């Protein structure tokens, strides 16, 4: 084995020289240069600095503006809450531990950090799935006369929390476990060992299939069908400028959504699966650290894509930030009036996130 396994930890370094120490008790500067820990702390500070305001602003603006309190926006609020879970439960902890060079908060802190980071990430992931399904149901109309209402939104919220809990809770109660990973300053599911009594193998297979592959398939299916529906509508109305513009807007939005989804989750899932299927192989601490923090950056991508690209929310946000007046409202209003010169069966409001 090209690593050192101990009680509730796995260090990706063979202890031939005797320098490997528990990540709960000693700085891990023998793994990488101390400057790397400083860089990690600075990166987490950046995520906190950007992630907290944009997600808090999402909650505040929605509460302040009654017209934003729509059933679909419940899911967007859920997304913001999930991101705040990651900010407070994961980012602040990792920033603090990276400043010390090891997981100074001990086993309890590792469990809490791993749980909140996993819970927040999974709530966000399944919220994106609910959004994708809602867009597919409304635009493609597989069920005629379907209208997304408050009851549907509540069921969607319940599903996101249920699925997230089904992923984050088991390691706390003995099905797998949370251990320090990468540079040993943050905690995640144990992909690294076959520790007796924890059934890591079955949990990793379950997590990869049910909490990565299934969401990925659903998102690709829903947005793929959505894009086809817009193209079909545009082909049926070749002279409709509004429809052509809607097609371009939806195409851009879908491409950005899919790319962001893959950038956030595919590197982490791929590396975790490789480590799991090649246990005992040699890899460095940075090998798992970089993908893990790509996934954490979803707390910034999500609100930018799913909320800031929503014109109605953007106008309300500008109004709030500018103390009740939107300096761009008149210009946008004129543009909106000009764009409504021709009716269309598919409009940008029908295919935007909200």
Swiss-Prot record:
Recorded hits in Gene3D superfamilies, A to Z, give: Rhodopsin 7-helix transmembrane proteins (1.20.1070.10)
**Mode of membrane association:** Multi-pass membrane protein
Q: Where is the lipid attached (S-palmitoyl cysteine)?
A: 322-323
Ranges annotated as spanning the membrane = 37-61, 74-96, 111-133, 153-173, 203-224, 253-274, 287-308
Give the source's domain of life in one word.
Answer: Eukaryota
**Record-listed N6-(retinylidene)lysine modification sites:** 296
Query: Where does the protein end up?
Result: Membrane; Cell projection, Cilium, Photoreceptor outer segment
Q: Which SUPFAM superfamilies match?
A: Family A G protein-coupled receptor-like
- Composition-biased stretches (Low complexity): 334-354
PTM comment text: Phosphorylated on some or all of the serine and threonine residues present in the C-terminal region. Contains one covalently linked retinal chromophore.
Q: What biological-process GO terms show up in the record?
A: absorption of visible light; G protein-coupled opsin signaling pathway; visual perception
Has the keyword Translocase been applied to this entry?
A: no
Q: Where is this site: Plays an important role in the conformation switch to the active conformation?
A: 113
Alphabetized Pfam families for the sequence: 7tm_1, Rhodopsin_N
Say where the protein is mainly found.
Answer: membrane
Q: Which family does it belong to?
A: Belongs to the G-protein coupled receptor 1 family. Opsin subfamily.
Protein name per Swiss-Prot or TrEMBL: Rhodopsin
Q: Which gene encodes it?
A: rho
């Amino acid at each position: 084995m090209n690593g050192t396994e101990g009680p509730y930890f796995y260090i990706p370094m063979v202890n031939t020289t005797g320098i490997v120490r528990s990540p709960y008790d000693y700085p891990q500067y023998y793994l990488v240069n101390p400057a790397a820990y400083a860089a990690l702390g600075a990166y987490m500070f950046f995520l906190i600095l950007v992630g907290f305001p944009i997600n808090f602003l999402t909650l505040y603006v929605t509460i302040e503006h009654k017209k934003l309190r729509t059933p679909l926006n419940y899911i967007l609020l859920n997304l913001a809450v999930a991101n705040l879970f990651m900010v407070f439960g994961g980012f602040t902890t990792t920033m603090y531990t990276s400043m010390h060079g090891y997981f100074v908060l001990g086993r309890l802190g590792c469990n809490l950090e791993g749980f909140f980071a996993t819970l927040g990430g999974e709530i966000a992931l399944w919220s994106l799935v609910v959004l994708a399904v809602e867009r597919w149901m409304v635009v493609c109309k597989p069920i005629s006369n379907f209208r997304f209402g408050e009851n549907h939104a509540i069921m969607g919220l319940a599903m996101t929390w249920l699925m997230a809990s089904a992923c984050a809770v088991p390691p706390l109660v003995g099905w797998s476990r949370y251990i320090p990973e990468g540079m040993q300053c943050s905690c995640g599911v144990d992909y690294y060992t076959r520790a007796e009594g924890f059934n890591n193998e079955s949990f990793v297979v379950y997590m990869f299939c049910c909490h990565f592959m299934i969401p990925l398939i659903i998102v690709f299916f829903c947005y793929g069908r959505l894009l086809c529906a817009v193209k079909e509508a545009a082909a049926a109305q070749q002279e409709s400028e509004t429809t052509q513009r809607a097609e371009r807007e939806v195409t851009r939005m879908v491409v950005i959504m899919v790319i962001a989804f893959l950038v956030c989750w595919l590197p982490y899932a791929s590396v975790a699966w490789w480590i799991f299927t090649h246990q005992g192989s040699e890899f460095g601490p940075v090998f798992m650290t970089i993908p893990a923090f790509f996934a954490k950056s979803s707390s910034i991508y999500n609100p930018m894509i799913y909320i800031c690209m929503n014109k109605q929310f953007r106008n309300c946000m500008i109004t709030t930030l500018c103390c009740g007046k939107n300096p761009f409202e008149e210009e946008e209003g004129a543009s909106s009036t000009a764009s409504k010169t021709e009716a269309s069966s598919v409009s940008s409001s029908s295919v935007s996130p909200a």
